[in-house]
Amino acid sequence: MPLEDTDTDARTPYQLPFPQDALQEIVIPKAIPDDERVWVPQAENVAFRPLCLNRSQGYWMNLLRVRKSGVLSRHRHPQAVHGLVLRGRWHYLEHDWVAEEGGYVFEAPGETHTLVVPDDVDEMITMFQVNGVMLYVDPYGKTMGYEDVFTKIDMCRAHYEKVGLGADYVDQFVR
């Protein structure tokens, strides 16, 4: 809806209270952390850094970091996924496009693909928002495993406890 009046005091902060049950915002000053312990290992040379683990709406946002070339995984998304490539590049075997540094990718619901990091890429970091579940599948669609926001939270708790940050370190990212 277009503005009906002119805001004559645009630099005055909002003066009313926020809704009583509104969740706190998440502010992460350094999304790509210096502390290696913040990265949660997912496989050899593959880790993620949680940004928002939204258990009430069933999605997660994270940085995916891959420090190897080759096939990462084949998976299906029943819901939409958004990605922003921060470092390096990658592609899917099923498509002829390449996701490059600075590029944005929308993955439509129902998409199944095989993520590959090229041989000449030392490090790839992509920010992903994954909605719902990610199903790991074989080439013929048979489900071999899954991830959702709850498995992500569990992985974080176990890792952060192990590296000395404490299992509750993940709580700052959970909404």
Question: Which functions belong to the PLM regions below?
Answer:
Residues W90-T114:
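Short acidic-glycine-tyrosine-enriched beta hairpin
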